[in-house]
A protein has these predicted regions:
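C-terminal alpha-helical cap/extension of soluble enzyme domains
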Residues: 2, 7-13, 35-37, 46, ...
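Active-site beta->alpha loop and helix N-cap motifs at the rims of alpha/beta catalytic domains
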Residues: 2-141
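Alpha-helix N-capping/helix-start residues
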Residues: 16, 22, 54, 146, ...
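A general structural signal for well-ordered alpha-helical segments in protein cores
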Residues: 25, 57, 61, 86, ...
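Alpha-helical structural signal in soluble globular domains
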Residues: 35, 59, 63-68, 92, ...
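Catalytic alpha/beta core domains of metabolic enzymes, predominantly
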Residues: 127-129, 139-244
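Glycine-rich phosphate-binding "P-loop"
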Residues: 135-137, 157, 267-268
Length: 307
């Protein structure tokens, strides 16, 4: 299986009482598929996977598959820092059917050595569902070494890697030794540079807000129209930046709340951002003519970075 284009790292909306808002989830999925997105990643980092129970985890993925069936690729976030837990979550997705691949994060906190990483990912890949490796050292505390990626890429079910290390050089290094192995950007602001050295797309946070625009930008770049893609990049760069002025997925959920998509509810230890960041987010949306229904105090777009 070949993955390419824009895959949205979909958020998980909550009701006022803290339960999953499946009505809002359905609306989000329908908006994504109507915009022509290539894929949806359910219950990854942006989906607040660490605070979902296993039952909720299964249900959110199942509902996403139901709502998006036949309209785009579905990637299920089933990674964990325990191999047995990753196996359990992945087996549940295989049993429900409908997912095209799983996203497997680098085991975090316990920081396994290279051989442990290799065995972990290989064990999950042996289940049969295609695997996207997720290299995110800022969260995992450890990078997947290049030699381990090379070994894993020999497995027929290891089909791609999501690169969220903030390094175009690393993408170059991967493509230099694995020219046919799929690399997906994990950073919206680095998507164009990564495509320029061989990446095939992005697992995007910003596409929660601008799915059609992100898809258009990536398609242009993949078709070789970097001048056209660069216009999108420059137009939305401030948005890419501002979605990470607080920890993800706080700012993208704040933006969706400002747009009236769902309630302003997080699960601890995540919580709302501060007023200054919220105002900046609202100003960014307004500057891009992205409709915001809530009222925020108008501020100059870049005023918080002028000191």
């Amino acid at each position: 299986m070949k993955l390419k284009g824009t895959i949205t790292a979909l958020v998980t909306p909550f009701c006022k009482n803290g339960t999953v808002d499946y009505g809002a989830l359905k609306a989000l999925v329908e908006e994504q598929t109507s915009a022509g997105i290539e894929g949806i990643c359910s219950v990854g980092t942006s989906g607040e996977s660490p605070t979902l129970s296993h039952d909720e985890h299964h249900e959110v993925i199942a509902k996403t598959i139901e709502y998006a069936a036949g309209k785009c690729k579905i990637v299920a976030g089933t990674g964990a820092n325990s191999t047995s837990e990753a196996l359990s979550l992945t087996k549940a997705v295989i049993e429900m059917g409908g997912a095209d691949a799983t996203l497997q994060v680098t085991p975090y906190y316990n920081k396994p050595n290279s051989e442990g990483l290799y065995r972990h990912f290989m064990t999950v890949a042996d289940l049969g569902l295609p695997v996207i490796l997720y290299n995110v050292p800022g969260r995992a505390g450890k990078e997947i070494p290049l030699d381990v990626v090379v070994r894993l890429a020999k497995h027929p079910n290891v089909v791609a890697i999501k690169e969220a290390a903030g390094s175009v050089e690393r993408v170059s290094a991967i493509k230099n030794v694995l020219p046919d192995f799929t690399v997906l950007s994990g950073d919206d602001s680095l998507t164009l540079p990564m495509i320029s050295v061989g990446a095939e797309g992005v697992i995007s946070v910003a596409s929660n807000l601008i799915p059609r625009e992100m898809s258009d930008m990536v398609r242009m770049a993949l078709a070789g129209d970097f001048a056209g893609a660069l216009k999108y990049h420059r137009k939305y760069y401030n948005l890419f930046h501002d979605l990470f002025i607080d920890v993800n997925p706080v700012m993208v959920k704040e933006a969706l709340w400002l747009m009236g998509k769902f309630e302003r509810v997080f699960r601890l230890p995540l919580c709302e951002t501060d007023d200054a960041k919220l105002e900046l987010c609202g100003a960014t949306l307004e500057s891009l003519s992205i409709e915001a229904y809530r009222t925020v105090i108008p501020v100059p777009l870049r005023s918080f970075f002028s000191s």
